[in-house]
Amino acid sequence: GGTWVSNVGLHTGKSPLVQLAPEHPICRGWTEYELFDEYYLHPTIGDEATPVLEVTANGEPVIVGWAYERPMSEGFAGGRAFGTTLGHFYKNFQREPFRRMVVNAILWTAGRDVPAGGADVALSEADLALPPKPAEAN
């Protein structure tokens, strides 16, 4: 659904994370919210992909999440994919709407049902207090 192209431009800052396809299962259970992340400015997304998420960077709309559903055809079982350029900062994963978007995308991609209210992504205070880097290997 998307292609990596070097030197696409980069912007780090805050922007509302907007649902371009609110009816898509990835968008269930969360609404637009302010997100601080690193945004790639000119992503290359396939014509068949569905833009799902957008931010505004440097005053311009930027697609930061897209979905692709490959149709079933003779000899091919089809399949789903979700791509995003988000997720550069640990603090975003501490936010429930961000986690819900990611887990919804995983469920949808795996062909699982996404609940109407979105995936359950509740964490305890202890979970949220975990350090942002993995523990040293023994």
Question: Where on the chain are the PLM-derived regions?
Answer:
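Extracellular/periplasmic catalytic domains that process cell-envelope and extracellular macromolecules
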Residues: 19, 44-46, 68-77
